[in-house]
Every structure is written in C-alpha cells, then in structure tokens.
Design a protein with these regions (language model features):
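Post-HExxH zinc-binding segment in Zn-dependent metallohydrolases
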Residues: 330-338, 363-364, 375-428
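Juxtacatalytic substrate-recognition/specificity segment
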Residues: 97, 257-383
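Zn2+-dependent metallopeptidase catalytic core
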Residues: 125-128, 200, 209-229, 240-244, ...
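Short, hydrophobic/aromatic-enriched beta-strand segments in well-ordered soluble domains
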Residues: 95-101, 112, 156-190, 212-220, ...
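C-terminal recognition in membrane/secretory proteostasis and scaffolding
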Residues: 394, 404-677
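Extended, low-hydrophobicity, Ser/Thr/Pro/Gly-biased non-transmembrane segments
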Residues: 173-253
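A surface-exposed beta-strand-loop module
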Residues: 85-86, 118-189
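Surface-exposed beta-strand/loop patches in extracellular or lumenal glycoproteins
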Residues: 93-126, 199-219
C-alpha cells in the first residue's frame, strides 16, 4: 500500500494548500495534466480529486487498520478468561475468552504480547499459539458450539482480528504450547502446570484497562496457588485490568507445600515445589526468607500489600533457572535441589533481589515501565538503577539479614568489580547505553553472530557498582546523616506514594534519570551532575577508592594468579571436550594470531588441552613467549603462534585500611547493619 499512502499524503498537502487560501501555487501545477486547466477549473478539479482520494484512503484505512491503532471504547468490554489443561502430557494450555460487546463494533483485535514485564527482550509469545477460533455468542467449550464461526484474519505476527458485525458477544479459544519452567515462560506436563501470564493470555486491543475475570479448571487433585490466592481451593479471580492479571504467576500441582509467616501485620507465604531432594532444609529456608523480609522492610517501611507469595521451584536440572518480580509475588526457579548448599545460597540471593523489586521497579520505576506497550520492547535508560541498584541491595540485604558476614559480602563486591573491570565492553558501553541495549542483552536469542562480548556490559553489575560508589560517597559527604537508602526512600515517596495516578495501571508517573540525579544531589548536599555524566552516561571507572575510604576500606589490584594470561580469549560456557572460543578481544594477541570465534583449541604448546586445563597450559609460558596453538576450524586443522603480552586479567580485592579511623569504622557499621538515619 505504499502508493496509496503516498496519494493520501499528496491529498493532505493539496488540502492544506487550499485551506491556506493559495490561488494557483499548488505542488502539482507542473504536471502536464494540471496545466490544461484554468485557475477556477483547477480549483474544482482539486476538490473532486481530494474527495475521491480521501474516500480511497478511508477504505484503505478500514481494510488495513493496524491493530494498535484501535481506540479504547468509552464503555469497557466484559472479558472473562478460562484456563484448562485437559491433556497435561501434550504441554498444551487451553484458553477460552468470553467477550461481551456493549456497543456494536466491526471487529475485535486480540493480541499476544511480544515480551513480558520483568524481562526486556522480545520473546514473541505468539509463536506458541495454535488453533485460534472464534464464534458468535457466549459458548464454552467452543468445540461443542452450534453458533456460527466468526471470520478471522491474522493481521500480523501477534494479532488476530475477529469480524463481529451483527453480534453483541463472542467466544474465542486457542491453545498455547508451554514446556519451559521459567519465570518468563510456561510449563505444562504430567507433574504440574506453571505459567507467566504474558506467555498465556491474549488481550483485547484497546481494552487492556478493562476489568477481567479468570477461572482455572485444573486436572483432578491439582491445587492452584498464586500471589492473589485468598482462600483454599480458590479457582476464580477478578482483576482490575489485564496488566495485573498477567502480573500474577501461578503454580498448579498436586504436591506443592506452603509455609507462612507475618511481619508487621503483613502475611507472607513460601510455596515450594521440588523435583529433587530437600534434605530437610525447607524450615530453614522459610526462616531465612523471613530474615530477608525483615531487613528489606526495615529500610523501606511497610509494603502496601496485605499478602505476598514466594513461588519457589527446585528444578533438579541444569537447564531451568530464573527469577521474576511481580506486584504481590515473585517466582524463583532454581536448577538443582534444595539440599545442595550452593543451590540454597543461590535461592536466598535471588529471593533478596526479587523481593527488593517490590519497591524498586514494581512501584518506583523508570517512566517507561508501566503501563506497557506489548508490541515493542519497553526501552528505558534507567535499568542500571532499576536492576543494577537492586543487585547491590540484594547482596547488602543478605549482609543486613545476617546471612552473609562482612568478609563474604565484600568478597562478592570485589568479584563484581573484577568482572566489570576485566570486561572489554565496560570501556565502550555506559550504564545508560547498556539499559537501552537490554533487548539484546536480556537473554534475547539470535542466530546472527555478534561482537557483544567485546562491546557490551550488563546493566546489572554496572549499576551495582555505581550504587556501591554512590552510597559510600553520600555517607561520607553527609557524615553518615544520609545514604543511598535515603535517596531510594525519597524517590519512592515522590514518584510513587505522593505522585498522582498517571494511568490505569498503578499510581505514580515513574521517574527519569534526571529526576534521580536531582534527588541524589539534594540528599548528598552537592551537585552530582558530574558523577552521573562521567560514570552513568560515560564510561569512566567509578572512584572506588575515594568511596571505600569513607568506610575504612581500599581496593587493591593485582594480576590474576589463576589466569594472568588469556591472550584475549573467552571460551564458550557449554561443556565441550575441547575448549571452544566464544570471542576474541579486540586488539589482543589472539586476534593478531588470526584466531576466530568458533575455533576449537586442540593444543597449546604441543600439549592437548581441555576446558579445565587450557589456562594452566597457557600460564606455563612467560610474558613475551611465542606460544604454538593448534585449532580446528571448519574441519581444518590450523597452527598459529600467539605472543603473550602483559597480563590481561586482574583480580580486585576490597581490604581493610590499616589507618582506618574510628569515624570510618562507625560509618561502615551503619552501612553494613542498616542503621537508618
């Protein structure tokens, strides 16, 4: 329709010229056709032309109207969802929608989200939709309906249009394939059903703000639990709008367990679904989660909900793993069994992170994050605050809850500094740019090779280190009177609690990076524009030692004892018999030697290597050595030499300052123990 669009544009131009009172200076007067007419006849000609083309434009717009352009009806639709799982082994969820139309309409568009709140990449959930049907009237299940089917047109990759002329209600049905245990996706099998709503439920375009109901019919003896379950055996829910409904992940199984506790009059439910050995650790898990809740509410104050649910799954495999925040719940997927000490520690780490999102992201949020446009990624410049600061506080809250000691907490921050400072992308990509690159970094899949390992850095650790630095600088600048804790509470109050509703979804309008810089400057008592310009918008290394000195600590750097030399090579993480190169650092000796991504390293210095031994083989050589490499590339064996330059991997370690003052030690104690100014 490019020609039709151009004609409409020319018509608008001619109409605008006519409205301005032009007397013959038309854009088309150079046309041989137009020059035959006198000025008056030409004016009449254009009136007829405009009318004819406008009619054509209107017809084209009706036939090709994009779904997103549909305006919201002044009268809400009545929308009811039903979810069934008649054959769990098929991995197919059955979704039915009853839609009552208060006024006649030519069509109804239904859309599947391209992405899900809490994730920032496009996942195109519509790819798992099948057997879409629609009939006139309210009729469930649709397979047994005698009513006539309604015409359906697939408008685009995520939109189905149902013609509704002559009907005041319709029933839509479709199936969704789900076999991924994840906070992002859905899984249905013989053991259980678990879903994230964005993967399962379509919405009526233009009617996301409308109230909706949901009824779930589970298989026999399966029980339902989510963050909005208010009674035993509940199967029906009412939600104020679609966005709240899909923000309610749900577990349906015969064998989940629930333990409860209360903090400051709020009820918390720890729901555990295990596929592996628990080793008797569930009571300890519940106690430790309560300690996390107490530490985080001590900083923020009481949350606005009455009840909150931790949905925790132990997948007992190496494939599953995720954590996702929601308004009244979180979903935590852990590979491995609860009985494993490492899995247990990782679970608490994820819980601390996700529960902090109750305030930071789910309520206090960048201005772009809610309500959502599910036709495109929610691009925001603020994920280094929303996610990176949450990373920082997740670790700090484990310390304040007594689940990490000082040494372990500082070791974690040291490791984060080591990871970021050794990443080549840290010198090329700012925290703000990383936030905008989230669709490429947030587990988005692509078959196209990229150079992101050399050019990108995650907003999680980048933001975490900015939070650490900013927190300690504010504490030092204000002599402990204020902190980043105080900044976050001020932001929460100004941009959520006291901010008028900006939409149907939640109160608050959200904040910009500039809003955050202003509030931080007010709390610190100094203008922090230079800090944010250099370290958030820019790529300079944050002033770690200046910040750490306020709490009697210092940052030391030394060549890595384990792998001082990598020659600029990063290996694939997947287990393979031989080391496989994932990326080559730009300007490295490996790049100079002609090594490529995808090369399989067979030997180093004539010594056969494995992923476990390759660094030891490389580290036998000294700086300046010309090391023989044998690699396999495209079924060819290639030999080359890599000259080792200066050490390219460093270890960073936060340590006690020998001259730490009593004042700095007092500031450190307030920082680590959460003393509230």
């Amino acid at each position: 329709m490019r020609g039709q669009a151009r004609a409409c544009a020319l018509t608008r131009a001619a109409r605008n010229a006519d409205n301005r009172g032009s007397t013959g200076s038309y854009a088309l007067t150079t046309s041989p056709l137009v020059t035959k007419y006198s000025e008056s006849s030409m004016h009449a000609f254009f009136q007829r032309l405009v009318l004819r083309v406008l009619l054509g434009c209107a017809l084209a717009a009706l036939l090709n109207a994009p779904a997103i352009a549909q305006t919201t009806s002044p009268t809400p639709f009545r929308i009811a969802y039903q979810l069934t799982m008649p054959r769990p082994a098929s991995h197919l969820f059955q979704v039915n929608m009853e839609i009552a139309l208060p006024t006649p309409t030519e069509f109804v568009d239904l859309q599947m989200p391209k992405w899900s709140p809490g994730r920032y990449a496009v996942f195109d959930f519509a790819k798992n939709v099948q057997e879409f049907r629609a009939v006139s009237g309210i009729c469930l299940p649709t397979q047994d309906c005698s009513q006539p089917g309604l015409p359906i047109t697939r408008i685009d990759d995520q939109t189905w249009r149902v013609a509704t002329r002559g009907t005041n209600s319709l029933t839509v049905s479709y199936k969704v394939f789900g076999d991924d245990l994840s906070g992002t996706f859905a899984q249905l099998d013989a053991r259980h059903a678990n879903y994230n709503g964005g993967e399962i439920f379509m919405y009526v375009v233009g009617h996301k703000p409308d109230p909706v109901t949901l009824k779930i019919d589970p298989p026999a003896n399966w029980r339902i639990v989510n963050g909005r379950t208010s009674r035993t055996g509940q199967r029906e829910w009412q939600f104020p709008n679609y966005d709240i409904m899909i923000d309610t992940p749900t577990e349906i199984a015969p064998d989940w367990t629930q333990n409860d506790f209360s903090v400051d009059g709020k009820n918390y439910h720890v729901v555990v679904h295990s596929f592996g050995d628990e080793g008797g650790k569930r009571p300890a898990l519940v106690r430790d989660i309560e300690r996390i809740v107490r530490a985080e509410t001590a900083m923020w104050g009481a949350p606005e909900f009455d009840s909150y649910t931790f949905l925790i799954h132990f997948a007992a495999d190496d494939r599953s793993g995720d954590g996702m925040e929601h308004l009244t719940s979180t979903q935590v997927i852990q590979p491995g069994a609860l009985a494993d000490p490492g899995t247990y520690e990782d679970t608490l780490d994820t819980v601390a992170h996700e529960f902090f999102h109750v305030w930071n992201v789910k309520r206090l949020r960048p201005i772009e994050l809610g309500p959502w446009d599910f036709t495109r990624p929610a691009n925001t410049r603020g994920l280094w605050i929303a996610e990176g600061f949450t990373n920082y506080y997740g670790h700090l809250m484990l310390r304040r809850a007594g689940l990490l000691d000082d040494a372990r907490f500082l070791q974690r921050e040291s490791q984060t500094i080591t990871n970021v400072e050794n990443a080549p992308g840290s010198r090329l990509m700012s925290a703000v740019e990383s936030s905008l690159s989230a669709p490429f970094l947030d587990r988005g899949t692509s078959i196209q090779r990229t150079n992101l390992l050399n050019t990108a850095i995650s907003y999680y650790p980048k933001g975490e280190l900015l939070a650490l630095t900013l927190d300690l600088l504010i504490r030092g600048r204000t002599n402990g009177a204020h902190s980043l804790d105080y900044v976050m509470r001020r932001m929460y109050e100004e941009f959520y609690l006291k901010s008028p509703n900006a939409s149907y979804y939640l109160r608050g309008r959200g904040y910009t990076n500039e809003d955050f810089a202003r509030v931080a400057s007010e709390v610190a008592g100094i203008n922090l524009e230079d800090f944010f310009a250099r370290y958030a918008n820019g790529v300079e290394t944050p002033p770690y030692n200046e910040a750490l000195a306020h709490v009697g600590l210092q940052l030391l750097r030394a060549p890595s004892e384990r792998e001082p030399y990598t020659a600029g090579i990063t290996l694939e993480r997947d287990e393979t018999p031989q080391p496989k190169i994932a990326s080559i650092r730009n300007g490295s000796s490996a790049e100079d030697a002609g090594l490529n991504r995808g090369d399989v390293i067979l030997s180093i210095g004539n010594e056969r290597v494995t992923p476990a031994t390759w660094t030891n083989a490389l580290n036998r050589f000294k700086q300046g050595a010309r090391v023989p490499f044998t690699v396999q590339r495209d079924r060819r064996t290639i030999q080359t030499f890599v000259t080792l330059g200066a050490p390219d991997v460093y270890t960073y370690r936060i340590e006690e300052k020998k001259d730490a003052t009593p004042q700095s030690l007092a500031l450190r104690a307030a920082w680590l123990n959460g003393k509230r100014p």
